[in-house]
């Protein structure tokens, strides 16, 4: 179930203020954030945001197709290394 339109999208205040400052200066630099729950807004397009995945910051370049999604969707937290290999040689 989505968020109420009356409330508007969630975005962390510190992240929004950093992006607005960079937009005023017309600068592009990587912004580190731990706020995976923040919604991507149109004013973020063109910026690179380093989203924390629990271990490191994953750089995510924001494009127009990402607007409306959450930052955490683009920084996977789990690494799948495959299932264990079966040892068929030791059977005989």
Curated annotation (Swiss-Prot):
Family of this protein: Belongs to the universal ribosomal protein uS19 family.
Record organism: Trichormus variabilis (strain ATCC 29413 / PCC 7937) (Anabaena variabilis)
Protein's job: Protein S19 forms a complex with S13 that binds strongly to the 16S ribosomal RNA.
Biological process terms in GO annotation: ribosomal small subunit assembly; translation
InterPro entries hit by this protein: Ribosomal_uS19, Ribosomal_uS19_bac-type, Ribosomal_uS19_CS, Ribosomal_uS19_SF
UniProt-recorded Gene Ontology molecular function terms: rRNA binding; structural constituent of ribosome
Keyword DNA damage (UniProt): no
Signal peptide as annotated in the record: none
Official protein name in the record: Small ribosomal subunit protein uS19
Disulphide bonds in the chain: none
């Amino acid at each position: 179930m989505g968020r109420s339109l009356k409330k508007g999208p969630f975005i962390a205040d510190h992240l929004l203020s950093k992006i607005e400052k960079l937009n005023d200066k017309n600068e592009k630099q990587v912004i580190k954030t731990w706020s995976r729950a923040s919604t991507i807004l149109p004013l973020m397009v063109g910026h690179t945001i380093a989203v924390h995945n629990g271990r490191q910051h994953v750089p995510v370049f924001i494009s127009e197709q990402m607007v409306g999604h959450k930052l955490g969707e683009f920084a996977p937290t789990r690494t799948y290394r495959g299932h264990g290999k079966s040892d068929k040689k030791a059977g005989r």
